[in-house]
């Protein structure tokens, strides 16, 4: 709940101060595996989608199986609350549909959509991106594409393994080395120590 409130507050503040479309408009949540990250992300997506001025919430996963798994989990929490897609064509229709408020998709489909649609109305909409497991796979090309194309966005990442400067490594072609450089400041933390203390793992 604290993580959800932190994200919603960040959306409110950065929207009021016109900081959407910048690193200051987002942030990341460090949640250990088994701490109810999917439920937290669902509640966040649901409440963010109801905020005044927010057009869509995109929940982005990095693999097709996670896409299906997340949809199943979301349906368990609230049937029909989110929209998943089997292809980029379906994703495009959902992005154009004002009633599709929460969309679950993969990085790959989002990348293809951006490649195929150089100009699109959705790029000017107020979009909240929530990346699940926001580590290396989201860095680089996809991140660059989003910040180039979308104008009024908030980027949030959930991760069990944040990358700090100490473990970022020197190699790689990407400018983004740490979770903070990609998503903004840490908004909430729930580590393995907290999970053990609470009896969740």
What do these predicted regions represent?
Residues 1-201:
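RecA-like P-loop NTPase motor core of helicase/translocase proteins
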């Amino acid at each position: 709940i604290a993580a959800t409130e932190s994200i919603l507050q960040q959306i409110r503040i950065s929207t009021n101060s016109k900081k959407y479309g910048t690193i200051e408009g987002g942030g990341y949540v460090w949640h250990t595996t088994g701490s109810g990250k999917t439920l937290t992300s669902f509640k966040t997506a649901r409440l963010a989608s109801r905020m005044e001025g927010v057009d869509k919430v995109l929940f982005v996963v990095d693999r097709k199986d996670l896409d299906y798994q997340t949809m199943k989990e979301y349906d368990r929490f609230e049937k029909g609350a989110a929209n998943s897609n089997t292809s980029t064509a379906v994703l495009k229709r959902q992005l154009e549909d004002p009633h599709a408020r929460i969309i679950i998709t993969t990085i790959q489909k989002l990348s293809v959509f951006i490649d195929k649609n150089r100009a699109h109305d959705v790029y000017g909409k107020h979009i909240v991106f929530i990346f699940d497991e926001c580590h290396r796979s989201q860095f680089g090309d996809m991140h660059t594409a989003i910040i180039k194309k979308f104008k009024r966005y908030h980027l949030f990442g959930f991760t069990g393994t944040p990358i700090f400067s100490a473990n970022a490594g020197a190699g790689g072609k990407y400018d983004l080395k740490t979770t903070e450089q990609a998503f903004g400041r840490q908004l909430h933390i729930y580590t393995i120590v907290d999970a053990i203390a609470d009896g969740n793992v």
